[in-house]
Design a protein with these regions (language model features):
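Adenine nucleotide-associated cytosolic modules
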Residues: 1-243
Length: 243
């Protein structure tokens, strides 16, 4: 699918980057990315992928906005309290970039609906706040051979994972979390969270999506990036496939 004249202007500052160019921008336009969970992580992912020009973006969330969300969920304002997140993000993204297609689902992800929700998309991005959902996305992304980009945050800490399940040698989320953690682990509701870590982790997730689409850069696939903003500690750890 070719780029229109207004798209060439809109994306001109990234098209001039040698690693992207016209060819890379076409790949971005032709891609389909699903974002599950529109909170602290999903908001920056949705914003930056829409600004980057991802051609089709899927949005899944069943929750409403409350006052405690506002400090870290960058697409919402006080006036949005009580509204459904998926509706607000959909409207915002359409204003940011009217050239892209949005598929929005006001649903709670579960075992019975997940396959039909994710099968259409190339890349699945996890922005959920519980490990049951993360492991469900991990399981079905693996079964359907998708690229899966996952994030988790708590306090000043963040984890970013990327898995390319089209490769049978890829490890998975359970390679890091051997069992599903208790809800208290990396749970911003229980432990608290600063808004900045949500923005940083979400932005890196969006960047990993772009790298996977275009096929550029040093890949995080099969690895975890561990971040602590309090001590400015950034570490990459290789993951091994569980047999």
């Amino acid at each position: 699918m070719n780029l229109k004249t207004n798209e060439l202007e809109r994306y001109s500052r990234q098209i001039i980057i040698k690693d992207i160019g016209i060819t890379g921008q076409r790949k971005i336009k032709n891609s389909k990315v699903l974002i599950v969970g529109l909170g602290g992580l999903g908001c920056p992912v949705a914003e930056y992928l829409s600004r980057t020009g991802v051609g089709t973006i899927g949005l899944i969330d069943h929750d409403k906005i409350d006052l405690s969300n506002i400090h870290r969920q960058s697409m919402f304002t006080t006036n949005d309290i009580g509204k459904y997140k998926v509706k607000v993000v959909t409207d915002r993204v359409k204003k940011i970039n009217p050239n892209i297609k949005i598929k929005s689902f006001k649903k709670k992800l579960n075992q019975s609906n997940i396959k039909n929700l994710i099968k259409y998309f190339d890349i699945i991005v996890d922005g959920t706040d519980n490990f049951a959902s993360k492991f469900l996305l991990n399981e079905f992304s693996r079964k359907l051979k998708k690229i899966f980009v996952c994030g988790a945050i708590s306090k000043f800490d963040g984890h970013i994972f990327s898995f390319n399940f089209s490769k049978n040698t890829s490890p998975c989320l359970k390679s890091f979390y051997q069992t599903i953690p208790n809800d208290e682990v990396l749970n911003c509701e229980a432990d608290g969270v600063v808004g900045t870590i949500a923005s940083v982790v979400g932005s890196i997730q969006a960047n990993e999506v772009i790298k996977n689409i275009v096929g550029i850069g040093k890949s995080l696939n099969g690895k975890v990036l561990i971040i602590n903003l309090l001590n400015l500690d950034f570490r990459v750890r290789n993951l091994k496939k569980i047999r």
